[in-house]
Amino acid sequence: DGDSLSVTNLEASNGELISNDDGTWTLTPSQDFNGDISLNYLVSDSNGGTVQANQLISITPVNDDPVVSGRVNLGSINEGNELIITSDQLLSKASDIDNENLYVNNLRVVRGQGNITDNGDGTYTFNPNQDWNGQVRLAYDIEDSNGGSVGVRAKLSVDPVNDDPELTGNKASLDEGVEDTSYIIRSSDLLIGFSDIDGDSLSVTNLEASNGELI
């Protein structure tokens, strides 16, 4: 009949439709949706005739980056000990909406003193520097199989342990004594050459002599 046609009652099977009031609509699919969206609508003419119609819009999937829900806590070790870290631990706060496999890459120390060794079997070894204790922060990337990635942080603590005193210099040479004469021995002389890496005060105990009486 040559009547003018118009579209009314436009509905989408997914997402949000907004009329732009100029003969166009904006369709915003739901977050992370991909697949077909069905459009149902009425085609009307200027004389009241209508017909139901439909169309399909295909939404192409795109890769979504992995996401993390927080910092990974790796616990604590004693000073001088090593820590074995597993990929499962490092991935424990990560997820991927596309259900892709996730991998750990570029694990490194960003705070604290120590080094990381990749054991090549999905585990890593952290070794703190000798005689060091404190807080450690690790950084790494979690990647999916399609190139998506996210940066992650992990923490652990290295707890102090007491270190034994060490002879780090030359021992004092004690003055010679005189026969049948008492000899004064000073703690300060016996401690010469010894040090303690923890900065603890040093004292002398269990002093024994190969001859004579000690008081």
Show which residues each predicted segment covers.
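Short, solvent-exposed loop/turn segments at the edges of extracellular beta-sandwich modules
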Residues: 43-49, 142-148
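Extracellular and select intracellular beta-sandwich modules with Ser/Thr-enriched
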Residues: 36-37, 49-55, 62, 135-136, ...
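Calcium-coordinating acidic loop motifs
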Residues: 33, 46, 132, 145, ...
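Extracellular ectodomain surface segments
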Residues: 1-12, 30, 51, 56, ...
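Strand-loop-strand motifs at the edges of beta-sheets in extracellular beta-sandwich domains
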Residues: 9-31, 38-40, 108-130, 135-141, ...
